[in-house]
Amino acid sequence: FNYCTYSYSMAFWDWKRWEKELDWMALHGINLPLAAVGHECVWRNLLLRLGFSKQQINNFIAGPAFLAWWEMNNLEGWGGPNPDSWYEQQEALQKKILQRMKEWGMHPVLPGYSGMIPSKLDLGKRIDSGKEKKTASDTSSESAQSTLNKWNGFDRPGILLPDDPKFTQIANLFYEETEKLYGTSDYYSIDPFHEAKSLPAGLDFGKAGRAIMDAMKKANPKAVWWYKDGQKPTSGNDESAESRRSAYP
């Protein structure tokens, strides 16, 4: 699987359909599948923990058929909002999927943290020395985040730069909320700056890669960064894509 598969084909699969798929995968020797169902539940819990309102969360998390591109930092909020019942359903479904994957000897690849954040909300108002604050502001924080170019006409989420202290703080919260719902994994899928035509000024790919790796390793020292080699930007700049790949640890 890649993320797109989850929206192209699997957005509304129930357990019966997933059970059939997982059994087929086991019969064909697949042992390292991406397990992205219910990733939005992690983000919902993280944002609630930071004091975001339901409306603010709805403006960030995409609807079921667009979750793949939201997870790849390409868009936010499109196709939503999702009802509370959706999050409850998908959390329960992911837990069944993970259990069956492990029963068949598979190693699930869970989504990791790339630096993505809501584009128009000030995280600095909510974080102080790693502790959440229950205050909110709808103003953007230039020091906390940067923005990437539009993706196929969609406004992209914000991105925390690796030298911003809030990167580590949000990453820690992300992995904590992931573990609460789904446990830890030995493999995490992280595709930073996906299909970006332009990047924040002064961005150091090496620093970004180390920050991503360090946060993942803090969650699980044995974890492996699972990187999908589909980083060619929509402008077709192969040199830029290669510089990103070579910089990551």
Where are these regions (language model features)?
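Aromatic-lined carbohydrate-binding surfaces of glycoside hydrolases
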Residues: F1-P249
